[in-house]
């Protein structure tokens, strides 16, 4: 585990002078005298897949022995490109710089490409940015939530996922999750004859079709089938547990309005991604269609994409994804805006967000008055082996770590046991088709 503080004394923990080759490779404005200051000496990326999904982990190292920071830059669809951005573009600009200057370094990297933004650059930037916050916490001897203002709550409520073919099966799973302590449960319903998002395949043949994304989608079948099932689930489980549902941006604006109207009686905690980012202009009409709380944002790659929706008060939950938004530096500002406009946060946290990314989420969750609910991934034993300190919910809540920084470490040796799949598939979200053969949003 990295040291939690640094000293200016001559002890073994004192920052060492940077090697000449580091200074030679450092950018034009990096200070030449590093003997008394903490400096970045290396930026390294690691690819690992302990759960099958590729993680991109960034480690920012310093001239203080044992002091480093970790960041999550994971986007399973653009893994190699993100690694290249960090290694080939960002790392050379960071050598020799002070890791404490997080705001300045974020602006430096963000503006370095001239054509700014986009998922690849933002995820790469997030890996560096979160690692710098991790270093800052270790130097200060404080956990992330304390750096962000301190605890606003004892623990962060989490939601888990269940799915099934019918209301009886799903309701039984919801009640079982409630017995385990979860007060919020996302429910996904299999639609016969379609490749339904968020549901388990029924057999090996369907699993193979899903792997190849060779299935088809039928929005009208979804609209006929899902609302009655959601209403029946609510009748079966009562009002003691909150229900969530994800439409996963597969509907047109008019279909989304119909869905909002039809699920009113299911009394959802929120309806997620009823509209794709490209259709965000239709949120006013969606809001007018009913009183169902609306959640959106996991696909947004710029915090400014949220601002018009917050200003018009047409969304209730911001589904922030820290890696895709460029890290904690911009996301903490978004969280403040969410609070000011009376909405709540519901950070994205499925299996494609590493334990490092989940720890970043929890820093925001525990410190923000605007927090609503945290999506909870199930991190299996191989993942916990690679990431000592992996956040794990207890009775449906994340209590967070009081260790300095993120509170999560990375075992490089263990990570090598779980290489990313080869060859990597980058087209799986583009292979779903409508009945007429046209490409369907994922």
From Swiss-Prot:
UniProt cross-references to SMART domains, sorted A to Z: MR_MLE (SM00922)
UniProt family annotation: Belongs to the mandelate racemase/muconate lactonizing enzyme family. GalD subfamily.
Membrane-crossing segments per the record: none
Parts forming coiled coils: none
Chain's role: Has no detectable activity with D-mannonate and with a panel of 70 other acid sugars (in vitro), in spite of the conservation of the residues that are expected to be important for catalytic activity and cofactor binding. May have evolved a divergent function.
SUPFAM superfamilies in UniProt: Enolase C-terminal domain-like (SSF51604), Enolase N-terminal domain-like (SSF54826)
GO BP terms in the entry: amino acid catabolic process
Keyword terms of this UniProt record: Magnesium, Metal-binding
Protein name: D-galactonate dehydratase family member SSBG_02010
Record GO terms (molecular function): magnesium ion binding
Lineage of the organism: Bacteria, Bacillati, Actinomycetota, Actinomycetes, Kitasatosporales
Binding, D-arabinonate: 248, 298, 319, 348, 375
A family per Pfam: MR_MLE_N
Organism: Streptomyces sp. (strain SPB074)
Residues that hold Mg(2+) according to the record: 246, 272, 298
């Amino acid at each position: 585990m990295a040291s939690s503080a640094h000293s200016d004394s001559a002890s073994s923990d004192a920052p060492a002078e940077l090697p000449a080759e580091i200074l030679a490779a450092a950018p034009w404005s990096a200070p030449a005298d590093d003997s008394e200051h903490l400096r970045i000496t290396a930026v390294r990326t690691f690819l690992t897949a302990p759960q099958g999904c590729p993680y991109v982990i960034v480690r920012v190292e310093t001239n203080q022995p044992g002091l480093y920071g970790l960041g999550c830059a994971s986007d399973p669809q653009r893994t190699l490109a993100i690694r290249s951005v960090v290694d080939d573009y960002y790392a050379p600009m960071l050598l020799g710089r002070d890791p404490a200057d997080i705001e300045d370094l974020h602006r430096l990297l963000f503006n370095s490409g001239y054509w700014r933004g986009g998922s690849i650059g933002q995820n790469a930037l997030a890996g560096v940015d979160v690692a710098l916050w991790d270093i800052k916490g270790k130097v200060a001897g404080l956990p992330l939530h304390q750096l962000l203002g301190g605890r606003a709550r004892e623990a962060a409520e989490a939601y888990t996922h269940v799915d099934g073919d019918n209301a009886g099966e799903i309701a039984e799973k919801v009640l079982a999750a409630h017995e385990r302590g979860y007060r919020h449960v996302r429910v996904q319903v299999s639609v016969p004859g379609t490749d339904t998002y968020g549901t388990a395949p029924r057999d090996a043949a369907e699993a193979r079709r899903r792997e190849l994304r060779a299935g088809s989608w039928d929005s009208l079948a979804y609209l006929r089938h899902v609302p009655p099932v959601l209403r029946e689930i609510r009748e079966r489980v009562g009002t003691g547990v909150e229900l969530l549902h994800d439409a996963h941006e597969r509907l047109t604006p008019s279909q989304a309005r119909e869905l909002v109207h039809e699920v009113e009686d299911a009394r959802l905690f929120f309806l997620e991604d009823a509209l794709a980012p490209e259709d965000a202009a239709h949120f006013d009409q969606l809001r007018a269609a009913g009183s169902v709380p609306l959640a959106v944002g996991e696909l947004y790659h710029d915090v400014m994409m949220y601002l018009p929706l917050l200003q018009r008060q047409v969304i209730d939950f911001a589904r922030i994804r820290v890696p895709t938004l460029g890290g904690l530096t911009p996301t903490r500002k978004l969280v403040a805006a969410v609070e000011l406009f009376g909405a709540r946060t519901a950070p994205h946290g499925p299996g494609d967000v590493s334990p490092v990314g989940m720890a970043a989420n929890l820093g925001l969750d525990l410190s923000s008055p605007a927090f609503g609910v945290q999506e909870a991934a199930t991190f299996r034993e191989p993942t916990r082996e690679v990431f000592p300190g992996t956040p794990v919910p207890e009775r449906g809540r994340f209590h967070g770590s009081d260790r300095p920084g993120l509170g999560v470490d990375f075992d490089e040796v263990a990570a090598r046991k779980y290489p990313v799949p080869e060859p990597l598939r980058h087209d799986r979200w583009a292979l779903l088709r409508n009945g007429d053969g046209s490409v369907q949003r994922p």
